[in-house]
Protein backbone atom coordinates (compact mmCIF):
# COMPACT_ATOMS: atom_id res chain seq x y z
CA UNK A 1 0.00 0.00 0.00
CA UNK A 2 1.40 3.38 -1.05
CA UNK A 3 1.48 5.97 1.68
CA UNK A 4 1.05 9.45 0.27
CA UNK A 5 2.98 12.21 1.96
CA UNK A 6 0.94 15.02 3.33
CA UNK A 7 1.23 17.98 1.01
CA UNK A 8 2.54 21.07 2.77
CA UNK A 9 0.60 24.24 2.62
CA UNK A 10 2.06 27.42 1.23
CA UNK A 11 2.24 28.87 4.72
CA UNK A 12 4.23 25.89 6.01
CA UNK A 13 6.76 26.21 3.16
CA UNK A 14 7.21 29.89 3.92
CA UNK A 15 7.71 29.16 7.63
CA UNK A 16 10.35 26.52 6.84
CA UNK A 17 12.24 28.98 4.63
CA UNK A 18 12.07 31.65 7.31
CA UNK A 19 13.43 29.19 9.85
CA UNK A 20 16.24 28.19 7.45
CA UNK A 21 17.28 31.79 6.95
CA UNK A 22 17.17 32.54 10.67
CA UNK A 23 16.53 29.94 13.37
CA UNK A 24 15.84 31.78 16.64
CA UNK A 25 16.12 28.57 18.69
CA UNK A 26 19.67 27.64 17.57
CA UNK A 27 20.70 31.15 16.53
CA UNK A 28 21.76 29.85 13.11
CA UNK A 29 21.80 31.91 9.93
CA UNK A 30 21.25 29.76 6.83
CA UNK A 31 22.26 26.64 8.71
CA UNK A 32 25.42 28.01 10.34
CA UNK A 33 26.19 29.71 13.60
CA UNK A 34 28.06 33.00 13.70
CA UNK A 35 31.26 31.21 14.73
CA UNK A 36 30.95 28.78 11.81
CA UNK A 37 30.42 31.66 9.35
CA UNK A 38 33.42 33.50 10.81
CA UNK A 39 35.70 30.47 10.34
CA UNK A 40 34.59 29.81 6.76
CA UNK A 41 34.96 33.49 5.78
CA UNK A 42 38.39 33.55 7.39
CA UNK A 43 39.38 30.44 5.41
CA UNK A 44 38.38 31.96 2.06
CA UNK A 45 40.02 35.27 2.98
CA UNK A 46 43.32 33.52 3.71
CA UNK A 47 42.98 31.22 0.67
CA UNK A 48 42.31 33.95 -1.90
CA UNK A 49 44.78 36.28 -0.21
CA UNK A 50 47.46 33.61 -0.67
CA UNK A 51 46.54 33.17 -4.35
CA UNK A 52 46.66 36.93 -4.90
CA UNK A 53 50.04 37.19 -3.19
CA UNK A 54 51.46 34.32 -5.29
CA UNK A 55 50.18 35.88 -8.52
CA UNK A 56 51.56 39.30 -7.57
CA UNK A 57 54.94 37.79 -6.67
CA UNK A 58 55.26 35.91 -9.97
CA UNK A 59 54.25 39.03 -11.92
CA UNK A 60 56.81 41.11 -10.02
CA UNK A 61 59.58 38.56 -10.69
CA UNK A 62 58.69 38.48 -14.39
CA UNK A 63 58.64 42.28 -14.67
CA UNK A 64 62.16 42.44 -13.23
CA UNK A 65 63.37 40.66 -16.37
CA UNK A 66 61.58 43.02 -18.77
CA UNK A 67 62.98 46.36 -19.88
CA UNK A 68 60.70 49.39 -19.73
CA UNK A 69 62.18 50.68 -22.97
CA UNK A 70 63.06 47.75 -25.22
CA UNK A 71 61.13 44.48 -25.57
CA UNK A 72 63.11 41.42 -24.51
CA UNK A 73 61.53 39.33 -27.24
CA UNK A 74 60.48 40.69 -30.60
CA UNK A 75 58.26 39.39 -33.34
CA UNK A 76 59.86 36.83 -35.61
CA UNK A 77 58.94 39.07 -38.53
CA UNK A 78 61.89 41.46 -38.80
CA UNK A 79 60.76 42.95 -42.10
CA UNK A 80 58.76 46.17 -41.69
CA UNK A 81 55.45 46.44 -43.45
CA UNK A 82 54.13 49.36 -45.48
CA UNK A 83 50.87 51.25 -45.15
CA UNK A 84 49.25 54.12 -47.00
CA UNK A 85 47.67 57.39 -46.03
CA UNK A 86 44.94 58.51 -46.29
CA UNK A 87 43.74 55.54 -44.29
CA UNK A 88 40.76 54.02 -46.08
CA UNK A 89 38.59 50.97 -45.77
CA UNK A 90 40.03 48.00 -47.68
CA UNK A 91 42.90 50.21 -48.92
CA UNK A 92 40.72 51.70 -51.66
CA UNK A 93 41.46 55.29 -52.68
CA UNK A 94 38.41 56.44 -54.62
CA UNK A 95 38.10 60.03 -55.80
CA UNK A 96 35.04 61.56 -57.45
CA UNK A 97 36.38 64.85 -58.73
CA UNK A 98 32.99 66.54 -59.02
CA UNK A 99 31.92 65.36 -55.55
CA UNK A 100 33.78 67.44 -52.97
CA UNK A 101 32.54 65.25 -50.16
CA UNK A 102 34.14 62.11 -51.65
CA UNK A 103 37.67 63.50 -51.46
CA UNK A 104 37.15 66.06 -48.70
CA UNK A 105 37.36 63.34 -46.06
CA UNK A 106 40.75 62.29 -47.47
CA UNK A 107 42.01 65.86 -47.28
CA UNK A 108 40.92 66.19 -43.65
CA UNK A 109 42.69 62.96 -42.72
CA UNK A 110 45.89 64.08 -44.46
CA UNK A 111 45.82 67.50 -42.80
CA UNK A 112 45.69 65.84 -39.39
CA UNK A 113 48.26 63.20 -40.32
CA UNK A 114 50.82 65.71 -41.62
CA UNK A 115 50.43 68.28 -38.85
CA UNK A 116 53.32 66.87 -36.73
CA UNK A 117 55.55 67.19 -39.82
CA UNK A 118 55.24 70.98 -39.94
CA UNK A 119 58.70 72.52 -40.19
CA UNK A 120 58.18 74.64 -37.08
CA UNK A 121 57.26 71.61 -34.96
CA UNK A 122 60.15 69.56 -36.32
CA UNK A 123 62.64 72.36 -35.64
CA UNK A 124 61.40 72.59 -32.07
CA UNK A 125 61.52 68.86 -31.27
CA UNK A 126 64.08 67.16 -33.51
CA UNK A 127 67.66 67.46 -34.78
CA UNK A 128 69.12 68.37 -38.14
CA UNK A 129 71.03 65.19 -38.94
CA UNK A 130 73.77 64.29 -41.36
CA UNK A 131 72.25 62.37 -44.31
CA UNK A 132 73.55 59.05 -45.52
CA UNK A 133 74.40 57.42 -42.20
CA UNK A 134 72.59 55.83 -39.30
CA UNK A 135 71.80 58.03 -36.31
CA UNK A 136 73.03 55.63 -33.65
CA UNK A 137 72.79 56.58 -29.99
CA UNK A 138 74.27 53.75 -27.90
CA UNK A 139 73.86 53.65 -24.14
CA UNK A 140 77.51 52.69 -23.41
CA UNK A 141 76.60 51.35 -20.00
CA UNK A 142 74.52 54.41 -19.06
CA UNK A 143 70.87 54.75 -20.03
CA UNK A 144 70.78 57.32 -22.83
CA UNK A 145 67.21 58.54 -22.52
CA UNK A 146 65.37 59.96 -24.31
CA UNK A 147 66.88 59.35 -27.72
CA UNK A 148 67.03 62.23 -30.15
CA UNK A 149 65.28 62.01 -33.53
CA UNK A 150 66.01 63.49 -36.94
CA UNK A 151 63.81 66.07 -38.58
CA UNK A 152 61.49 65.06 -41.39
CA UNK A 153 60.02 68.32 -42.60
CA UNK A 154 56.74 68.62 -44.38
CA UNK A 155 58.36 70.72 -47.10
CA UNK A 156 60.33 67.62 -48.15
CA UNK A 157 57.08 66.32 -49.60
CA UNK A 158 57.13 68.93 -52.36
CA UNK A 159 53.88 69.16 -54.32
CA UNK A 160 52.29 66.74 -51.85
CA UNK A 161 53.06 68.80 -48.75
CA UNK A 162 49.66 70.48 -48.86
CA UNK A 163 51.26 73.81 -47.92
CA UNK A 164 49.48 76.63 -49.75
CA UNK A 165 47.99 74.02 -52.06
CA UNK A 166 44.70 75.05 -53.70
CA UNK A 167 44.33 71.55 -55.20
CA UNK A 168 44.06 69.87 -51.78
CA UNK A 169 46.88 67.35 -52.30
CA UNK A 170 45.76 67.04 -55.91
CA UNK A 171 42.42 65.45 -55.03
CA UNK A 172 40.34 68.26 -56.51
CA UNK A 173 42.08 67.93 -59.90
CA UNK A 174 42.29 64.15 -60.18
CA UNK A 175 46.02 64.03 -59.39
CA UNK A 176 45.91 62.64 -55.84
CA UNK A 177 48.85 62.20 -53.50
CA UNK A 178 49.14 58.91 -51.62
CA UNK A 179 51.62 58.70 -48.75
CA UNK A 180 53.64 55.57 -48.06
CA UNK A 181 54.87 54.98 -44.53
CA UNK A 182 56.98 52.15 -43.16
CA UNK A 183 55.94 50.49 -39.92
CA UNK A 184 58.34 50.88 -37.02
CA UNK A 185 60.64 47.98 -36.14
CA UNK A 186 62.94 48.42 -33.15
CA UNK A 187 66.66 48.31 -34.01
CA UNK A 188 65.98 47.82 -37.71
CA UNK A 189 68.87 48.49 -40.08
CA UNK A 190 68.43 48.68 -43.83
CA UNK A 191 71.82 47.09 -44.41
CA UNK A 192 74.67 47.82 -46.82
CA UNK A 193 74.78 51.46 -45.63
CA UNK A 194 72.61 52.49 -48.56
CA UNK A 195 69.43 54.52 -48.35
CA UNK A 196 66.19 52.73 -49.09
CA UNK A 197 63.74 53.76 -51.74
CA UNK A 198 60.11 53.07 -52.57
CA UNK A 199 58.96 51.98 -56.03
CA UNK A 200 55.37 51.70 -57.25
CA UNK A 201 54.00 49.75 -60.21
CA UNK A 202 50.71 48.55 -61.61
CA UNK A 203 50.14 44.96 -60.52
CA UNK A 204 49.10 43.74 -63.97
CA UNK A 205 49.88 44.90 -67.48
CA UNK A 206 46.57 46.72 -67.83
CA UNK A 207 47.13 48.36 -64.43
CA UNK A 208 50.56 49.59 -65.50
CA UNK A 209 49.01 51.12 -68.61
CA UNK A 210 46.16 52.78 -66.73
CA UNK A 211 48.40 54.01 -63.92
CA UNK A 212 50.12 56.57 -66.13
CA UNK A 213 52.91 58.76 -64.83
CA UNK A 214 53.65 59.73 -61.25
CA UNK A 215 56.27 61.62 -59.27
CA UNK A 216 57.67 60.88 -55.83
CA UNK A 217 58.71 63.08 -52.94
CA UNK A 218 61.43 63.02 -51.70
CA UNK A 219 63.06 62.44 -55.09
CA UNK A 220 63.17 58.81 -56.24
CA UNK A 221 61.12 57.79 -53.23
CA UNK A 222 64.23 57.66 -51.06
CA UNK A 223 64.23 57.08 -47.30
CA UNK A 224 67.47 58.19 -45.69
CA UNK A 225 69.44 56.08 -43.23
CA UNK A 226 69.48 58.87 -40.65
CA UNK A 227 65.95 57.92 -39.55
CA UNK A 228 67.23 54.56 -38.29
CA UNK A 229 67.56 52.74 -36.01
CA UNK A 230 64.32 53.20 -34.14
CA UNK A 231 64.73 52.61 -30.40
CA UNK A 232 61.12 52.18 -29.32
CA UNK A 233 58.23 54.38 -28.25
CA UNK A 234 59.56 55.14 -24.75
CA UNK A 235 63.12 55.81 -25.88
CA UNK A 236 62.27 57.69 -29.08
CA UNK A 237 59.62 60.00 -27.72
CA UNK A 238 59.66 62.47 -30.62
CA UNK A 239 60.50 60.01 -33.39
CA UNK A 240 59.02 61.04 -36.73
CA UNK A 241 58.48 58.36 -39.34
CA UNK A 242 59.87 59.22 -42.77
CA UNK A 243 57.33 59.32 -45.58
CA UNK A 244 57.28 58.92 -49.33
CA UNK A 245 54.57 60.79 -51.22
CA UNK A 246 53.40 59.53 -54.62
CA UNK A 247 51.56 62.01 -56.83
CA UNK A 248 49.65 60.28 -59.62
CA UNK A 249 49.49 62.61 -62.61
CA UNK A 250 47.32 61.00 -65.27
CA UNK A 251 45.52 57.91 -64.04
CA UNK A 252 43.01 56.63 -66.58
CA UNK A 253 39.65 57.91 -65.29
CA UNK A 254 36.72 55.69 -64.34
CA UNK A 255 38.96 52.61 -64.17
CA UNK A 256 40.06 50.74 -61.06
CA UNK A 257 43.84 50.50 -60.97
CA UNK A 258 45.69 48.04 -58.73
CA UNK A 259 48.91 49.59 -57.43
CA UNK A 260 51.71 47.91 -55.50
CA UNK A 261 54.48 49.84 -53.74
CA UNK A 262 57.61 48.20 -52.33
CA UNK A 263 60.49 49.26 -50.16
CA UNK A 264 63.85 48.33 -51.65
CA UNK A 265 66.73 47.61 -49.28
CA UNK A 266 69.47 45.03 -48.91
CA UNK A 267 67.85 43.09 -46.07
CA UNK A 268 64.14 43.55 -46.78
CA UNK A 269 62.41 40.61 -48.45
CA UNK A 270 59.36 41.64 -50.46
CA UNK A 271 58.49 38.28 -52.01
CA UNK A 272 57.04 36.47 -48.99
CA UNK A 273 53.66 35.20 -50.16
CA UNK A 274 52.65 34.37 -46.57
CA UNK A 275 52.74 38.04 -45.60
CA UNK A 276 51.33 40.40 -48.19
CA UNK A 277 52.42 43.47 -46.21
CA UNK A 278 56.07 42.54 -45.61
CA UNK A 279 57.99 45.34 -47.28
CA UNK A 280 55.11 46.19 -49.60
CA UNK A 281 51.55 47.40 -49.79
CA UNK A 282 48.90 47.00 -52.47
CA UNK A 283 45.95 49.34 -52.88
CA UNK A 284 43.30 50.27 -55.41
CA UNK A 285 43.11 53.69 -57.01
CA UNK A 286 40.13 55.01 -58.94
CA UNK A 287 39.57 58.52 -60.30
CA UNK A 288 35.97 59.10 -61.34
CA UNK A 289 35.19 61.83 -63.85
CA UNK A 290 31.76 62.65 -65.21
Curated annotation (Swiss-Prot):
Residues of this chain annotated as glycosylated in UniProt: 96, 118, 153, 193, 197, 220, 238
GO BP term, pick one: neuronal-glial interaction involved in hindbrain glial-mediated radial cell migration
Gene Ontology CC terms: apical plasma membrane; astrocyte end-foot; astrocyte projection; cell body membrane; cell projection membrane; cytoplasm; external side of plasma membrane; lateral plasma membrane
Disulfide bonds: 129-150, 160-177, 200-261
Transmembrane segments: 40-67
Subcellular location, record wording: Cell membrane
Keyword vocabulary terms for this entry: Cell adhesion, Cell membrane, Disulfide bond, Glycoprotein, Ion transport, Membrane, Potassium, Potassium transport, Signal-anchor, Sodium, Sodium transport, Sodium/potassium transport, Transmembrane, Transmembrane helix, Transport
UniProt function note: This is the non-catalytic component of the active enzyme, which catalyzes the hydrolysis of ATP coupled with the exchange of Na(+) and K(+) ions across the plasma membrane. The exact function of the beta-2 subunit is not known.
Protein family membership: Belongs to the X(+)/potassium ATPases subunit beta family.
Protein name: Sodium/potassium-transporting ATPase subunit beta-2
Amino acid sequence: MVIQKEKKSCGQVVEEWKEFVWNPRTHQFMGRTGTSWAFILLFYLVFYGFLTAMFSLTMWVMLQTVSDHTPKYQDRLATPGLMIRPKTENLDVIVNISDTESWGQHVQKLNKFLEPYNDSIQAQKNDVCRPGRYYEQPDNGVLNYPKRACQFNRTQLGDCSGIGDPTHYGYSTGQPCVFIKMNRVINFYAGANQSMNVTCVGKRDEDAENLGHFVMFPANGSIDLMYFPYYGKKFHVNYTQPLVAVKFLNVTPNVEVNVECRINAANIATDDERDKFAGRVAFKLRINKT
